[in-house]
């Protein structure tokens, strides 16, 4: 569909964005849906962030996705937050409602929908590698599903402790914090029903890295999940598969988040299978350009 004066604007703000697949996924999906919209990648330097709300209103953007490092920093500039965004203290979708900017967070729901799509039961005890913003959203969602115990491992113990306290204060689940090291991971992984890598270790271009070793995973019966989707098969998941463990990559969560974004901004359900196909094909091209 040709661009014209009626073309509606959407986009992604963050820094850096050169490896993001969101513009490709959203633009092809919008075309598939027959909508006169365009989705732009907007690299914003930190000092320019306060100018974004007025730009959204002036240019009449329908909405934006928000990624690192602005998920928390954008909040003071918004007019309203969804319950999830307020609870998590982070926003990844902004909807422009006639100049009224409403912030949402779809991270946790995206992960839960991905689990359901794969038929994975998270069980009773979740172990998190990393205690940043992604871990916060996913942990809160799992607590809502009834996961009774959540353990957080991080190289920054104070960050893990803060997240554990946050979950304990807002749910009936028991949450604990530990300093990330081999012995603690091995001990906790033996009783975990699901282990989730919420760290960037293993993400493109450092695809040969894993937050833990094969020996660390030996003896665990947990489902392994990686929030990384580039590459589709992270080193962490490969090690688990070598030991016969069930695994789930971050593609489903990424696509579900994208679908939820379009539902929020457009009020329509997008073609989920098509969105996944677009991203998967692009990632496979990166692995094998021929």
Swiss-Prot record:
**Active site positions:** 71
Give the top-level enzyme category.
oxidoreductase
Q: Which Pfam families match?
A: SDH_C (PF18317), Shikimate_dh_N (PF08501)
Query: InterPro entries of this UniProt entry?
Result: Aminoacid_DH-like_N_sf (IPR046346), NAD(P)-bd_dom_sf (IPR036291), SDH_C (IPR041121), Shikimate_DH (IPR011342), Shikimate_DH-bd_N (IPR013708), Shikimate_DH_fam (IPR022893)
Q: Where does NADP(+) bind?
A: 130-134, 227, 250
* Recorded catalytic activity of this chain's protein: shikimate + NADP(+) = 3-dehydroshikimate + NADPH + H(+)
UniProt EC number: 1.1.1.25
The entry's shikimate-binding residues are: 20-22, 67, 92, 107, 229
Source superkingdom: Bacteria
Q: In which pathway does it act?
A: Metabolic intermediate biosynthesis; chorismate biosynthesis; chorismate from D-erythrose 4-phosphate and phosphoenolpyruvate: step 4/7
**Which BP terms does GO give this entry?**
amino acid biosynthetic process; aromatic amino acid family biosynthetic process; chorismate biosynthetic process; shikimate metabolic process
Any one Gene Ontology molecular-function term assigned to this protein's record = shikimate 3-dehydrogenase (NADP+) activity
Which NCBIfam families does this UniProt record tie to the protein?
aroE
Q: How does it assemble?
A: Homodimer.
Q: Which family does it belong to?
A: Belongs to the shikimate dehydrogenase family.
The protein's name in its UniProt record:
Shikimate dehydrogenase (NADP(+))
Q: What is the lineage of its organism?
A: Bacteria, Bacillati, Bacillota, Clostridia, Eubacteriales
